[in-house]
């Protein structure tokens, strides 16, 4: 385990703690989840380079694609929530029903 791996693991732990302590703002939750998935993708790529295996790189690419889709859907929900309520708060998501 080298220094880059330790830095990425530290960033991932910071992101998890951000999810634990921040539960109200949707934008922050989206940014933290992007950070976590990005670091996981980088860890997969670094592991595949160290092991000389292509599956880690393919997994990193899959995670990157999933992250982009999650970001687009999340931002669409934020735009709809803001246009209906004028507030970006996770507690107001129930106002999007029907």
UniProtKB/Swiss-Prot annotation:
Broad class of the protein's primary localization: mitochondrion
- Protein's UniProt keywords contain Nucleus: no
Query: One GO BP annotation here?
Result: ATP synthesis coupled electron transport
User: What's the catalysed reaction?
Assistant: a ubiquinone + NADH + 5 H(+)(in) = a ubiquinol + NAD(+) + 4 H(+)(out)
A molecular function (GO) held by this record is: NADH dehydrogenase (ubiquinone) activity
Q: What are the EC numbers?
A: 7.1.1.2
Report the subcellular localization.
Answer: Mitochondrion membrane
Q: What keywords are assigned to this protein?
A: Electron transport, Membrane, Mitochondrion, NAD, Respiratory chain, Translocase, Transmembrane, Transmembrane helix, Transport, Ubiquinone
Q: Any transmembrane segments, and where? A: 1-21, 26-46, 61-81
Q: Which GO terms describe its cellular component?
A: mitochondrial membrane; respiratory chain complex I
Q: How does it sit in the membrane?
A: Multi-pass membrane protein
**Any keyword NAD?**
yes
| Family of this protein | Belongs to the complex I subunit 4L family.
Function, in words: Core subunit of the mitochondrial membrane respiratory chain NADH dehydrogenase (Complex I) that is believed to belong to the minimal assembly required for catalysis. Complex I functions in the transfer of electrons from NADH to the respiratory chain. The immediate electron acceptor for the enzyme is believed to be ubiquinone.
- Give the protein name, as stated in the record: NADH-ubiquinone oxidoreductase chain 4L
- According to its UniProt entry, this protein's organism is Dictyostelium discoideum
